[in-house]
Amino acid sequence: MTQTSPQGEGRGPHEQGREILEGVRVGIAHHLGWAVAVTASAGHEVVDRRRIELIEPGMPAAPIEHDAKPLDDAAAARLVAEVRASALRATSASLDQLAASLPGPIVSMSLRAWPLDFPDDIAVQRRPPYESRADSVMYCQVLSDCAYERGWQVHLYGAKDVEAQAAGILGERAGDVLGRPRATLGPPWTKDHRISLAATIVAS
């Protein structure tokens, strides 16, 4: 996935510039070790889309669900701590690179919602019903921590309904705003991209 040029058809340069000066919003659709990031202006124009790395090369992307299975709880906890530290370094670097390349300051980041009372104890995380979600939650927490460290607001969204929520906010503009990027920017424009853009709209 590559970053894109601003999507500004139908808007004057002064209006686009004013919207960008107001700040841009980032929507994230994360996976294990990487994420799709879509950045939009206050007027919901896509100014950047890219894949970002959330973990360093060579580190296990899903320690709880896979790599820690043969380990005892103490060894599993050490492995998860190493992976989390790697994720923090990689995510910080990815977000700093993103922020440095944008035409305006980032004001918020939108992330998929996760249970805020998710257990911290690794021994508990290794048991059902937590083990299938623990690694994903770790990435959410790392992304959130990185955003707060940079002074960005953090918004949480539900992946199943965020597109409908965005359409409700946009009203008659929904088809144009949500459908235009695929036509004007070309591939890649996947479900992850649509969800990420919708999340920035709901956060605005």
Predicted features along the sequence, with ranges:
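Phosphate- and other anionic-substrate recognition elements at nucleic-acid/protein interfaces
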Residues: 1-4, 17-204
